């Protein structure tokens, strides 16, 4: 299986998107290198500047799964511009988190993550999600030394 490279990506920062607290079923392998489970797949993904590499991912998997998951068809530049026209108080937030995209996650995983997130911090939530997946999920392989299981929706 080959790698799929997405070049000239705008308004996307992989680290900001994954680590902002909207998803928890991922492991950071390196500075810009992650493995995550979502939509019935395990993805090893990294970003260097404006190029995102989806390892062991064919183009059809990117188009059918990850393009929607990472909301890559949406024009975030236009959204940010419109927000700033209406309220310049958002400028600092937009500038500091310029690369966050809204992930299109499975409803059940989002719901369970929200329920267990009450009064907890991100590292603890990630551990709980990982433990639940390891106990009840289907093993998908080892990536970067980390055992990965299917997303909670597939339990």
Which residues are covered by each model-predicted region?
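HhH-family (HhH-GPD) DNA N-glycosylase catalytic core used in base-excision repair
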Residues: 1-153
């Amino acid at each position: 299986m080959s790698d799929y490279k997405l070049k000239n990506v705008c308004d996307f920062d992989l680290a900001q998107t994954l680590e902002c607290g909207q998803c928890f079923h991922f492991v950071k392998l390196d500075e810009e290198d992650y493995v995550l489970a979502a939509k019935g797949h395990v993805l090893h993904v990294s970003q260097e500047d404006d190029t995102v590499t989806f390892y062991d991912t064919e183009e059809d998997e990117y188009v059918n799964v990850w393009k929607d998951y990472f909301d890559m068809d949406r024009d975030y530049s236009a959204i940010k511009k419109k927000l700033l026209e209406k309220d310049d108080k958002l400028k600092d937030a937009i500038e500091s988190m310029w690369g966050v995209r809204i992930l299109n996650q499975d409803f059940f995983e989002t719901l369970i993550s929200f329920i267990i997130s009450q009064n907890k911090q991100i590292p603890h939530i990630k551990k709980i999600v990982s433990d639940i997946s390891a106990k009840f999920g289907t093993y998908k392989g080892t990536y970067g030394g980390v055992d990965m299981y299917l997303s909670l929706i597939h339990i």
